Amino acid sequence: MVYQVKDKADLDGQLTKASGKLVVLDFFATWCGPCKMISPKLVELSTQFADNVVVLKVDVDECEDIAMEYNISSMPTFVFLKNGVKVEEFAGANAKRLEDVIKANI
């Protein structure tokens, strides 16, 4: 499942609901070409690993406060959280790395 976060309170609620699962925060922008390219792979992976992974998309233009909190400077940036703790982060539309990091952390 891929869910687009509306604001900080929404993100906090989603993180609480995802307790025990790997959370992938996808920081993106609607105008970002690489973000659009990686999006179908992210949907595919969220379906493939639905029992263990929650994908939360964060539009950096709509949720600037969240992007600032996570020090996001380029898109897409993926932040991986487990039980509220960051376990990995990388920037760029690298589908292989995205899949590898998910598999390594579920």
UniProtKB/Swiss-Prot annotation:
Q: Which residues make up the annotated site Deprotonates C-terminal active site Cys?
A: 26
Q: Name one GO molecular function term.
A: disulfide oxidoreductase activity
Claim: Disulfide bond is one of the keywords in the record? yes
Q: Which residues form the active site?
A: 32 (nucleophile), 35 (nucleophile)
Q: Name one Pfam family in it.
A: Thioredoxin
Q: Membrane-crossing residues?
A: none
Q: Which domain of life does the UniProt lineage start with?
A: Eukaryota
Q: What's this protein's family per the entry?
A: Belongs to the thioredoxin family.
Q: Which NCBIfam families match?
A: thioredoxin (TIGR01068)
Its recorded name reads Thioredoxin-2
Q: Which organism is it from?
A: Drosophila melanogaster (Fruit fly)
Taxonomic lineage of the native organism: Eukaryota, Metazoa, Ecdysozoa, Arthropoda, Hexapoda
Q: Which gene encodes it?
A: Trx2
